[in-house]
Amino acid sequence: VDIDPAIRGLAEQHFLKDRARGEFIAEDARRFVTDTTRRFDAVVVDVYSARMSIPAHLVTREFWAASRQALKPDGVMLANLILDGRLATPYARNLLATIESVYGRCGIDVLHRGQAVSNVVVVCYSNPAGAPAAVYSDERNRADTDVIRAN
């Protein structure tokens, strides 16, 4: 799915060196995940409106919720984001918090940690495994029990 129909030809010519084998859909990503009735094993979000800018309508809770709805029950969402490599700016913190408000805990890999600009890969599952996580405290510390159960 890409909003620009010319992307298919560019991808086939410069990256694939052959015709794309899958279906290409020229449509806005948000409109697609909102309107589709199909369910996918994976949704990859790799969208930019400029070198370091993601379109505003693709960073909202509503977009991420629609992307999750487009997944099969055991599906995975992978997002390639451009953020600061320290994850310290309000934009980086807020975008990651928005994604995790929909998906729960996600894996986050900063490719150039500490740099002003970095690719940040986020991996989330449509149905995270296990029961809700508990917080260890001095009053209720079950860490040793959890370690034994895990082994």
Residue positions per predicted region:
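The AdoMet/dcAdoMet-binding core of the Class I SAM-like
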Residues: 1-78, 82, 86-96
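Soluble small-group transferase modules, centered on the S-adenosyl donor enzyme superfamily
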Residues: 105-151
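Alpha-helical structural signal in soluble globular domains
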Residues: 14, 98-102, 126
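Conserved Class I S-adenosyl-L-methionine
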Residues: 89-110
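A generic structural signal for alpha->beta connector loops
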Residues: 19-21, 74, 103-105, 144-146
